[in-house]
Amino acid sequence: MSISLKINIVGANTVKTLRFAPDMCIQECCTHIFEKTNEGGPDHGLYQAHIEGKQSARWLAMEKTLQFYDINSDQQLDYKKKHRPQKFKLLDGTIKTQLVDESQNVSEIVNSICKKMGIKNPEEYSLMNSAGAWLNNTQILSEQGISENDITVLMKKFFFNDANIDRNDPVQLHLLFVQCRDGIIEGKYPTQREESLALSALQCQVQLGDYNPTKHVPGFLTLKDYLPLQWLKSKGVEKDIFKEHKKLVSMTEVNAKYRYVQLCRSLKTYGMTSFDVKIREYGKKKMVDHILGITREQMLLMLTETKEVIMTHPLKHIKRWAATDKSFTLDFGDHETEYLILQTPNPEQISQLIGGYIEIIMKARKDSSKVIEKEDTAMGVEEVMAVKKGSVANSSSYMGYGAGGGGANQLQPSQQIPITDLKSALRATDLLIGELGGFRSSTGATPQNFTRSFTTLTPQQFKHQLISHTNAMAIAAQGLFQDMTTPPPTGGIAAFQQAITKRAQIIMAELNTVGTAAKNAGYFPDMASFSDEIIGVATKLSESMARLLAIGSTIQGTDCDEKSQKAAQTEIFNVQSLVTLMMAACDNEYVTDSSSKLLIECAKNVSAAIADMLVVGNSKVEFIDDELLLGQIQNTLKSTSLTSDELLSTTENLASTSCHPESRKQITNITQSALNQSNALLTAFKSGEIPEQDYNLLNARVSDIIESVNLINYAMDCSEREYKISITSNGVEVGEGEILAGTNLTEEFATVANDLTNAIMTMRSNLKNPDTVMESYKMVAGHANRLITCTKAVASRADTQSQQRLFNSTNAVFESVANLSNHCRSYIKNPEQEAHTFQIVETAGHLQFLTQNMSTDAGKIACITSLRDYSKEMIAQVSSLISTSRTSSQYLPDANGITLLKGAKDVSDALSKLMVGIKKVVLDPKSEATQMELLTLAQKQSLPPMNLVSTCKRFAPKISDPNQKQRLIFSSDAAAQSVQKLMKAGEAYKRICGHIEIEEALEVFDSTIADLETTEIAIAGGFLDAVSGTTREGAAELLMVAIKDLNKVNNELVTDIRVNPARLGDLVKSATESASSVAISAKTLICATTGKQVQKKLMGITKQLMIDMEQLIRASRSVASNPNDAASELLLDAASNDVSISTAALVGSTANVDCKELDEASADISNLLSLKMGSLESILSQPTEEFAFYVEEIASSTKALNAASQQVVAMARNKNLKGLGASAKITASALSTLVSHAQNAIVLTENEATKNAILASTVALGGQIIGLLDFSKARIANY
């Protein structure tokens, strides 16, 4: 079924009639129009003009369908550009032209204008039309009759944050000055004569400059441009103005504007918006004229004639208010005994102003995370009500929230529509969707009417009630579906309509309650940061209800056709999953975008596998002869199809919250249900004894489903929770920009760091020109803010320790930028002082150091994050390719189809392995081992997907169906691109984290060790060739030089890697080169040394040194990847100690130190440990005393060994060779005694753990003594 629409192509000034499917989205419609007419382009959209009494003007959203907007045949839509130039004027007369998006509402356009002008707090500004009326912030320009040629005025509507505007914000200061000046002159802010004189003098200083006695004399000023009307004829007023002006000599224009604004702020009526109202006073029939004034703090009521203030109330005293066509009613609760009813032609404007001020107040409290005190809770129940015939209307909806003093609740437009049938319910739902959209902070809109409910409920109770009402709405929706599909047995159409109308009323009552609750969520400090998500879920529920009601409204009579039933059932599935989504939203548990997309693609894969199975199943039904079994199979086929739809709908809704237990449970249950039904279908066909070949085909399809379900389970295991990160410094949010979707943070860090370095260099070069310093500073600050924004994005994915480290870094950068700002301003004021120049240079250098460190640290985390994300993207795209391949195999010759299916199966196994690697990194994100394992898996498991891509592209031309061929080619290209992205991410990870240098280093060490082992074989065989022309003394000297160089490089590596991880690659490269030099020198020495035993000893020590260096390199990578991690640093220290011991042993064996006793002691200890303490089984001691005796002897021997070791150290330091030999023999003897007692203790104890502990401790102590002797020999050799 299609509909015919008249499309007015505005650019070509023609109208064409085209046909569209009702379920086409607006984007598809625009593409269709472009293809048919060759008019327009990406900037064009569809616009529905205003229809009096039926439809307000609106732009149709690209993602919505024609059916959603209830577009019927023969209606006309405009096809035109969304953007147009629009002129707006400032109060100083300046006219600016800006390109605006017509589809945006006024609030969004004002946001855009303010952003370009550098105006903060855009929510306080709005546009005024030529008649002096404020435009409605929630409506588009064309809806309010603003054409391209009209000029609107940008003005400050709300005076709330203007106290924060100072001399450093010249744009806003100028706009505020002009608006204050006009307000004073027009009499909006009544002033005394002295106040008017002071303000006029400041205005003279701004506009005329310093006082000039020859020029500035009475008669010079046009007084009506400086004074309000009431003081124009005051005696000597111009002379008094110049008298005050004379006092302001040398005051700058900016300071004069600032003083002017400050003085205006001190006025009681400052920022007051006035409305002419009438009040019927007690005992009088005639209405009395008054002025109602509203400021950021209070409401004032004044007599029109005398301007006497007869009533004031802080805004927080207003319990509720209501606007009708010609009146406005205020309820002050306990502060007044009666309602204040005002007759006014502008009730809606008053309502908007009060609502706007309170919204800004509550937003400011929410943003600063302040807890609302008890005395402020009155503002929490301020509400707007619909009032008819002067009475305050009570709303029956949502009375449980904000019940402070029994106040009534706001009746939004969506709540004012009486629900008499499904179409009225549908209109109310559409209005509710618009209202919810206005409440989302991301839109920047300022909704007209807020329902504010700071309630006595705790956040947990609030969440519980919100979820309860959501559940109730879902139950009501299920009831509506049953009524639609199962009409009442009696009563006919009337009973049917009555039943579904009653259901619609229940649905709308609950839906409005949910919508109201969602709006109030933002005013709970604990929920403010994720209130948009809650509103988003409420919006989705409303949209789903709208679609369900639309389906119901199309039912003719009492019969719901199969297509409508299926569409309605889909919405019921949708609503059920959205109930769970609301639970997750209230708990603020969301996963990363890559995790969500992966899960959705896996669900699509399952759904496609089920669809393939259903195709086969439906084609084999004809083989079933048993009618009972046939009915069972047909029912199972139908229920499996529904479950597949439910799975896809549920996963698409809940994928973003798959870390929440309820979301995961629901997805798992539906997935398992689909699997069970598939197996049941297979069993039923088997009972029907269908041909074996057909059964095998069906079995293969069920196997595909099982594989796809496994991928869903893996995908949920890989889900990563994402956190919203807020970093503040001195109460100021740091890094307020946004990261665009799809931004490669790894590349972004490199780019921003480079831009920041260039900006700092530019600033340094501009120090000779004070006029350009601030511009240079702004560039530096902009790049620093961008870097902080990127860091926040990375921190949202990091572990707690890394987050804290990044927070500290961003705060340090922010404070450094602030210091740089202060120094720049001081320099501009006094450019001659060299101290300011020095401070700028010093602070800029410090900032550069901080940003480089932060960029390196966050960049590494971004690398592993990108590796995970691109792994998931690859899995998602390849999963889609698997699904497409399975379907495509049916269109290929048998042999080719089998090959394609086999390739798909191989890929499923590869994806499962890769997801296991992702899961490990998610569970332990700091582990270098799991990161390297994921990197290896990503490289290895990318081969099967690429093979499948190659197979698909090879077989694609053979596919008979052209559409399927195109799908396979498209899916293959997407999969190939995702694999390429993953490979690039892997290379970036290795490059940025220093892993390329480390991998090269490890390869060098493997090669060196292999070469040493070859030399070891040559030594054992006796065919090691000496190097001609090389003496042992010369080789030993070269080795000592190489060892000293290695020692220096290793010290630098161990020290610098802790404070500057960015140097990992350079440090590792230097250490590898030095170690290679040591190995080459040691090999030369071995060739120049005679005697196999000596050669073997040197070779063994050199080989051990290379192994220890390899471990040192690995440990340094761990420290660089996990800064300030105690475990990694402990590993580095241990590896460094092992290298030192091996180096000392090599020096001791190399040096020509004639100390026979020392060598003998070292050999004796080695033999002792290997023979007597090699293992528990080798201990054959026969103790003669008790276990306790030997424990005491071990302690005594340990003390003796310690004393002997200290003597060895003393002799080595004094280079007393003779004393060193004697001390070494004593130490060996003490160790021998200790070993003997340890053996006896091991034999006596029956505890295996104690045995192993004594053995390990003794062997370790012996190893340390050997190392000590080697160090001593190295000391004697001047090492």
From Swiss-Prot:
It is found in: Cytoplasm, Cytoskeleton; Cytoplasm, Cell cortex. One of its GO terms (molecular function) is phosphatidylinositol-3,4,5-trisphosphate binding. Pfam families: FERM_f0, FERM_M, IRS, Talin_R4, TLN1-like_RS. InterPro entries: Band_41_domain (IPR019749), FERM/acyl-CoA-bd_prot_sf (IPR014352), FERM_2 (IPR035963), FERM_central (IPR019748), FERM_CS (IPR019747), FERM_domain (IPR000299), FERM_f0 (IPR032425), IRS_PTB (IPR002404). It comes from Dictyostelium discoideum. CDD domains: FERM_B-lobe, FERM_C_Talin, FERM_F0_TLN, FERM_F1_TLN. GO terms for biological process: actomyosin contractile ring contraction; cell morphogenesis; cell-cell adhesion; cell-substrate adhesion; cleavage furrow ingression; mitotic cytokinesis; phagocytosis; sorocarp development. SUPFAM superfamilies: PH domain-like, Second domain of FERM, Ubiquitin-like. PANTHER family: RHEA, ISOFORM B, TALIN. Its main location: cytoplasm. Residues 84-365 form the FERM domain. Keywords: Actin-binding, Cytoplasm, Cytoskeleton. This is Talin-A. GO terms for cellular component: cell cortex; cell trailing edge; cleavage furrow; cytoskeleton; filopodium tip; membrane; pseudopodium. Signal peptide: none annotated. It comes from the Eukaryota. Actin-binding protein that may be involved in the control of cell motility and chemotaxis. The keyword Thylakoid does not apply.
